[in-house]
Regions:
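C-terminal-most transmembrane helix of multi-pass membrane proteins
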Residues: 2-5, 45-47, 122, 223, ...
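Loop-to-transmembrane alpha-helix entry segments
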Residues: 67-70, 96-105, 120-141, 162-164, ...
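Specific transmembrane alpha-helical segments of multi-pass solute transporters/efflux pumps
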Residues: 22-29, 61-99, 141, 232-248
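Hydrophobic alpha-helical transmembrane segments of multi-pass integral membrane proteins
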Residues: 11-15, 37-56, 68, 72, ...
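Hydrophobic/aromatic residues within transmembrane alpha-helices
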Residues: 33, 42, 88, 118-123, ...
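Membrane-interface helix-cap regions at the ends of transmembrane helices
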Residues: 2-3, 21, 25-32, 36, ...
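Specific alpha-helical transmembrane segments that line the substrate/conduction pathway
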Residues: 41-51, 87-121, 250-269
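Glycine-/small-residue-enriched transmembrane alpha-helix faces in small-molecule transporters
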Residues: 1-41, 84, 137, 150-184, ...
Length: 316
């Protein structure tokens, strides 16, 4: 079982950097799994593999040490995020739209920072808000395509498949909410294994009721490979991120997570044959730039709070 006890800060940070790479693979792999097995069956297999991974790396938490609010509200919020994300990818209509939906979901870093400022009293600077605007502008550029932004084009793309985009936004908001709850109620408890077990049960029940089983009855070779790599990637991402957060450099890991969309796009070009125009890449650049600006504004604020806290302790 992985443990941060015997790792230095630099070693733990290097392990934590595995998480953004694995998350960058997730959008395309989820789509491949859905196409190979159907939504519920594919995700059931995915989370079975992931659960085995985290059982051996993270282990089961002590229920007696979990805050009741975290258990009853926080963990279900994480499950809702997983379900919304998978439904968003499954209901997308093509390779490029899958990436658009994925980019909407990738608003979670900026939303997480915003929630931390609003609900967790994290200090920040004024350029947080321009950063949020830039990140949202990137989504607008992506949805408008290579022809440039127009309200008509934006409305047409959204009207084409609104459910998928709304689900992606729901996934982003709920993940940001879960992150905020983790900061407030999580303590030292790591509930990853519980979350994965519940996710497995949810998709298992959906599969039994025949939900999302239309694409392929018996799975394809591409779907099987996607399940294996997807399960390992998701499990490794959670395990690595948890270890990195517990002992590594949080600032470096937070900055690295904002490059997940870029890694996702690179992986998609050969895994799901996504055709990405220049407008899409311009939007990716804006999302990354806006998210980094948000991180910098919050990072400076957190450093200021730490300095103030040390001064108060010295005065006492």
């Amino acid at each position: 079982m992985l443990s941060a006890r015997n790792l230095s800060t630099n070693q733990a940070t290097l392990v934590g950097l595995i998480a953004p790479i694995c998350w960058g693979m997730s959008v395309s792999l989820v789509r491949g799994i859905a196409e190979g097995f159907g939504l519920a069956q594919g995700q059931f297999f995915l989370y079975c593999v992931s659960t085995l991974c985290v059982l051996f790396t993270v282990g089961m938490p002590d229920f007696r040490k979990i805050d009741r609010r975290y258990l009853l509200i926080g963990i279900p919020t994480a499950n809702l995020s997983s379900l919304s994300f998978c439904l968003a990818i499954f209901t997308s209509s093509g390779g490029a739209q899958t990436m658009e939906v994925g980019m909407v979901n990738y608003l979670w870093p900026a939303l997480t920072i915003l929630f931390a400022v609003l609900f967790n009293r994290i200090g920040t600077r004024w350029w947080l808000y321009p950063g949020l605007v830039i990140a949202f502008a990137g989504i607008v550029v992506i949805l408008s395509g290579d022809q440039g932004f127009s309200f008509a084009e934006f409305a047409a793309r959204f009207a084409e498949n609104p459910v998928s985009y709304v689900l992606a936004l729901t996934a982003a908001v709920t993940w940001a909410g879960y992150s905020s709850m983790t900061r407030a109620w999580g303590g030292t408890t790591n509930p990853t294994t519980i979350i994965f077990i519940v996710d497995t049960m949810i998709f298992g029940i959906l599969w039994l009721f025949g939900f999302g089983a239309e694409p392929v009855a018996a799975g394809s070779a591409h779907g099987i490979v996607s399940v294996i790599f997807g399960g390992i990637a998701v499990g490794a991402a959670y395990a690595a991120w948890t270890l990195g957060m517990s002992r590594g450099n949080m600032a470096v890991l937070a900055a690295a997570s904002y490059f997940t969309p870029v890694l996702s796009c690179v992986f998609a070009t050969f895994w799901i044959d996504a055709e990405l125009d220049s407008g899409f890449w311009s939007g990716v650049a804006l999302v990354v730039a806006g998210s980094l600006l948000c991180w910098d504004a919050t990072g400076r604020g957190m450093r200021a709070l730490k300095v103030a806290g040390k001064k108060e302790k010295n005065e006492e």
